[in-house]
A protein has these predicted regions:
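Short, membrane-interfacial amphipathic segments enriched in basic
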Residues: 7-60
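Membrane-interface helix starts
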Residues: 51-62, 66-78, 256-257
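Short cytoplasmic-facing helical segments at TM-TM junctions of multi-pass membrane proteins
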Residues: 135-160, 244
Length: 272
């Protein structure tokens, strides 16, 4: 009897564990489907915008680009310079002097891998969290419901300008981060490795190709779309002010993990 009881308990624990693992595996797919549904609603809302609202949409998109990309260009350049200097020290320790190899390392490790991830991380923490808090407050004020009652689509009014602004802003910030990283690494290599600055900059620029830039650009745009969809959809689920602080950590984590997955998928396409 005891043996049969132990087998029944073990069987119950096994099926409970399998059910838990199955639900955990299904969560990413469910979130992806929710994201695609939200994107479809946002894109469909663009077709509902009347002629008089396009001027507002354009102005709000430009405003988003200014707050996200223009105001933070200096910050991204300075941070990129520090990251580039830190990245150069392992190359100095391993005494890598070949400029062609140094340029190759910059392309593979920084331009197409680490820098887009860092740019997405910074934008998610700075602009993404601000968007979640802003839209969450609007949702808690029931302003979104009032606009919907007036016949104004909240997805086209609130989400679409931020989506367009992020699609244009994140590639700009990634470029500024690349510039800072290149300058910081070049300065350290010039001081410690006697690698001339013009030669290093030349090999970094010469290794860039249109296919690689297009693939990296597509990756950054995909990350930008993912960030806005996650942050906005989380904000639209807010019901009261107390829900806003609870939504911020989850939105940040989901956005950044999704950006890592996007980077991994594009790396498999690039190198696989």
């Amino acid at each position: 009897p005891n043996g049969g009881l132990m087998k029944a308990v073990a069987r119950a624990w096994f099926w409970r564990g399998a059910e838990t693992l199955g639900s955990m595996a299904a969560k990413p797919a469910a979130r992806l489907l929710d994201e695609m549904d939200f994107l479809a609603v946002v894109l469909a809302s663009a077709g509902l915008i009347v002629r008089g609202q396009w001027r507002f949409l354009f102005g709000h998109t430009v405003q988003q680009i200014y707050f996200t990309a223009v105001q933070r260009a200096y910050l991204f350049t300075v941070v990129g310079s520090i990251i580039g200097a830190l990245m150069a020290f392992p190359l100095i320790v391993f005494r890598i002097h070949d400029p062609a190899l140094l340029g190759r390392i910059m392309h593979i490790m920084m331009y197409h891998q680490l820098n887009p991830i860092l740019a997405a991380l910074f934008v998610t923490g700075l602009s993404g969290s601000a968007i979640t808090a802003e839209l969450g407050e609007i949702k808690a004020n029931q302003a979104i419901d009032h606009l919907a009652a007036m016949g104004v689509d909240p997805h086209g009014f609130f989400v679409l300008p931020r989506l367009l602004g992020m699609i244009l802003s994140l590639p700009i910030l990634t470029c500024w981060l690349n510039v800072g990283v290149t300058v910081g690494a070049a300065a350290m290599l010039d001081i410690y490795q006697n690698v001339p600055l013009p030669i290093f900059l030349g090999v970094c620029a010469s290794g860039l190709s249109y296919p690689s830039l297009a693939l990296t650009g597509a990756m950054v745009v995909t990350q930008a779309i993912h960030i806005i969809l996650v942050q906005s959809s989380r904000a639209f689920r807010v019901r009261a002010y107390v829900d806003i602080p609870r939504a911020l950590p989850g939105a940040f984590a989901q956005s950044f993990v999704g950006c890592l997955i996007v980077s991994l998928l594009f790396s498999l396409i690039r190198y696989g």
